[in-house]
Curated annotation (Swiss-Prot):
The gene is atpH. It holds the Pfam family OSCP. SUPFAM superfamilies: N-terminal domain of the delta subunit of the F1F0-ATP synthase (SSF47928). It is found in: Cell inner membrane. The keyword Cell membrane applies. This is ATP synthase subunit delta.
């Protein structure tokens, strides 16, 4: 996975810088999302693995994408096809979104709780995280009944384990030391 990220990063950075310069971040995010889905299609993936000439491959890919790509998006597809990198489009999208979130000061926070959180609890957690991290927070909530009670929050490098399972584990470690 890290190899794909390394390959995808320069393409994502170039697309991102261009999108910022033109004020078209959301349009580029949509184009890359569409291209990523096209590249993940099993028939297209087989085509990308085949022995098709890069120029022909770019034209086929662009024709599949149709009007979803503007002129500059088509240029990106041509460059990636010339370098045999169309398969890393999902990675380009991933890296682009990371850059976009950094630019817009948005961070994804994974919140795992023992029970389903109410809308009010989600709003409270989001507000407290935004104050602490000084960023907009996008919550991704999930339920894990093995936590027994409480929540685990992961946002970037920050991990807050306020679950009963985590507390019991820390208590056990303390008693054993």
């Amino acid at each position: 996975m890290s190899e794909m990220a390394t390959i995808a990063r320069p393409y994502a950075k170039a697309a991102f810088d261009f999108a910022v310069e033109k004020g078209e971040l959301s349009q580029w995010a949509q184009m890359l999302t569409f291209c990523s889905e096209v590249a993940k299609n099993k028939d297209v993936a087989q085509l990308l693995d085949g022995a098709v000439a890069s120029e022909q491959l770019a034209e086929i890919f662009i024709s599949i994408c149709g009007e979803q790509l503007n002129e500059f998006g088509q240029n990106l597809i041509h460059v990636m096809a010339e370098n045999g990198r169309l398969k890393v489009l999902p990675g380009v999208l991933e890296q682009f979104i990371l850059l976009q979130h950094e630019f817009e000061k948005v961070i994804d926070a994974d919140v795992t709780s023992a029970i389903e959180l109410t809308e009010q609890q989600k709003a409270d957690i989001g507000a407290k995280l935004e104050a602490r991290l000084e960023r907009k927070v996008k919550l991704n909530c999930s339920v894990d009944e093995t936590l027994l009670a409480g929540v685990i929050i992961r946002a970037g490098d920050l991990v807050i384990d306020n679950s009963a399972r985590g507390r019991l584990g820390r208590l056990s470690e303390t008693l054993q030391s």
